[in-house]
Structure formats: C-alpha cells, structure tokens
Amino acid sequence: MIDVLTTDAYGKNVFTKYCISQDGNLAVMDVASCIGLNMTPKEKRNPMIASSKGVGIMMKDALSRGCKKIIIGLGGSATNDGGMGVLSEFGVRFYNSKRELLVPSVYALSQIAFVDKRYARLPKDVEIICACDVKNHLLGKNGATYVFGKQKGIYLNQMSEVERGMAHYCMKLKQTFHVNVNEFEGSGAAGGIGSVLLGVMQAKRVSGIDLVVEYSGLK
C-alpha cells in the first residue's frame, strides 16, 4: 500500500492510498480516493470549480515508481472537468484568448482558445485499464453532465451552459490530439476523466466485475 500526497477536487492537499503489486509492475487506484464526491459535505460542493488534478498526481506517482500497468477505478468523483485537471498535471496547458493560463475547472472549459502540448509528458509504454461499469459518453443527454451532474451539485439551469463548455473542450482536444474523445464508451465516467484516459492516453475500459473475476480466479 502506497501513501501519496495529492489534492482533492478543490485543490486542498490530502493523503490517499493506492496499491502496487509485489513485483512493482501494477498499480491499482481509484479516483474517488482523492477527488471523491463523498469527501465534501453536500452543502459545500461546488462542481464548477472542482478539478481532477489529484488523479493525475496519483498516476504520476505510480509511474515514477516504475509501474507499467495502472488499473484505475472510475466513479464517484466530485468533478465534471472532462479530465482537464489530469491532462494539466501531465504537462498539457490550456490558455484563453488572452493567452492567460487557465486553471482546470468547469468554468475553464468554455474559455479554452489554445491547447499547448509541447511540454506534455503523457504516459508511454504503460497499459492503463479503466475499471468502469458506466458506458455513458462524454456529451449528450446521456452524457457526463446531464446524467451525473445533478448529484455533484450542478443545477438544472446550469446544465446547458456546462454542456456547451464540455463540447467546446471536446473540440479543442480533437484539434490538438486528433481524436474524438466523445466516441468512446465510458468517456463520460468520473466527470469525463474517462474521455482523457480512453481517448488521449489510449486506455482500455473493462467492467469492474470482469476485473474482480479475472484477478480473484472466480468463474
């Protein structure tokens, strides 16, 4: 069991844990362990400023220890930033029309004018598995915002604005990384973190129960 200092959905330093196999090749972690919805009382939740950066910190810690495979559980996040925070932690920079650096959040999605990947250090030669039973795509009435946004604190009168921001973000990712992250089943998981892992980092989505069966030897 590894202890790591990361950040919660609102940028506060928190310690969390994840597991590394005895041979050091496999890391198993969960987004909810650092940016979980249940970590913040309902009356204090603000998904409009929440970021997935903490997940990126946790992933980078595992990579720094030499892990070649990461299984990451998607679900229960307090965020709806489309994984913008994860990408920023791996060196991707987002700027507005004034060339001002944007802090990852729902508010920032619609302001993105330019994405700079020149200094990005995305995972290479690493297998990433998303443990995810959710098949929802990033966008649409069955997407991240409309299906899961309410439980995170997004009000009904904010939904369309947030969805437009997410669609704009999706377009900017396509321009930068030449992939439509909305195409992937599960891209809407964990507030859209799935879109970055599956689309940009070329992860594989596997249902949670299938992983349990595989690693427990159950039939």
What are these regions (language model features)?
Residues M1-L74, A78-K219:
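N-terminal loops that bind phosphate or other acidic moieties
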